[in-house]
Regions:
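Extracellular beta-propeller repeat domains
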Residues: 2-321
Length: 321
């Protein structure tokens, strides 16, 4: 699929491998005409720039874009088609300029960045890799949480690269394995929150975790381990409401077997999980909610399911809560 400009797809598939949107594009509104201008600003080649940029982009205050490519970059023994990249597309007076700012090697630094990066309060980039983190995890879903520090403003050459720091390497056991496809979230105190699709102990149904900065490092705390009855496979990450409660979805299991919507409330005794809704594969409301959640101004939750009622053979629904 390399050198493709754009691939439109109708169905939503599990896993990042089949998401083949192979370009960065921009839609510019022409207000007077109520129209949109579609412009491709970069075509991925699968080489140093990466391949399969499925996670979307983040924009900074200056209008620069940042994103990840699942694989590509370089070929290594650990991941022969490349272990993925982080890139930026800067808006300059001469047009858009694409730059690869990190190539993953597949070892201690991680492999396969499945989510886009987010900007932290320190203006550095934070993200996760689905695999890697150590030699024992190269071809397994252990994964990492990382940050990328930009070069000094005065330095404009390739001799001043972005600096990667791995904040946490998942061990694949009770601490979780395979960070989910949703972006990381910061709280007001600067802690990071995310999910792992696997791991968490004997059940291996996934976790919600917190990373807290302390003494120059980061400490992981698993705030919930899924058991199956409350869902499994929290692929899409979590979001906060204004009260500091976390909300997310699991793609599978739950009391009805088709995934769940859940909340995690902070209390003096720790985080308390509550299942808000369990999806039924034989219900027209759909099931397997792979995507993330979104609040409107009134506090309603919105999301999607990837599949609809097995008896009807549907292709998914939108839902609100």
């Amino acid at each position: 699929m390399r050198h493709s400009r754009l691939i439109f797809y109708e169905k939503v598939f599990r896993g990042p491998f089949l998401l083949g949107l192979l370009c960065v594009f921009i839609l510019t509104a022409i207000v007077s005409a109520r129209a949109q201008t579609f412009t491709v600003i970069h075509n991925f080649t699968g080489l140093d720039d990466g391949e399969q940029p499925a996670a979307g982009v983040t924009i900074d205050a200056a209008g620069n874009l940042y994103g990840t490519a699942w694989d590509g970059g370089h070929g290594y023994l650990q991941c022969q088609s490349g272990c993925g990249t982080v890139y930026t597309v800067r808006h300059t007076s001469g047009g858009w300029k694409f730059e690869t700012i990190h190539l993953f090697l597949g070892g201690n630094d991680g492999a396969y960045p499945a989510t886009t990066v987010v900007l932290g309060p320190d203006h550095e980039l934070y993200g996760t890799t689905y695999a890697g983190g150590g030699q024992q995890c190269v071809n397994q879903a252990c994964g990492t949480v990382f940050k990328l520090r930009p070069p000094p403003t005065a330095c404009t050459t390739a001799l001043c690269p972005w600096l990667e720091t791995v904040l946490y390497r998942f061990q694949g056991g009770s601490d979780g394995s395979g960070p989910g496809y949703g972006s990381l979230r910061f709280d007001a105190a600067g802690s990071l929150y995310g999910t792992t699709i696997w791991g968490g102990g004997g059940t291996g149904f996934g976790t919600v975790y917190e990373l807290t900065p302390s003494d120059g490092g980061w400490t992981e705390n698993v705030i919930h381990r899924f058991t199956g009855s409350d869902g499994s496979g929290p692929e899409s990450g979590v979001i906060f409401d204004q009260a500091g409660t976390l909300f997310g979805t699991t793609v599978d299991s739950g009391s009805q077997g088709g995934g769940t919507v859940f909340e995690l409330s902070p209390t003096s005794a720790g985080w308390v999980e509550n299942t808000l809704y369990s999806f039924d594969p034989f219900d027209p409301n759909g099931y397997f909610p792979i995507g993330g959640l979104l609040f409107d101004d009134a506090g309603n939750l919105y999301g999607t399911t990837s599949t609809e009622d097995e008896g009807r053979g549907g292709e998914g629904v939108h839902f609100s809560s």
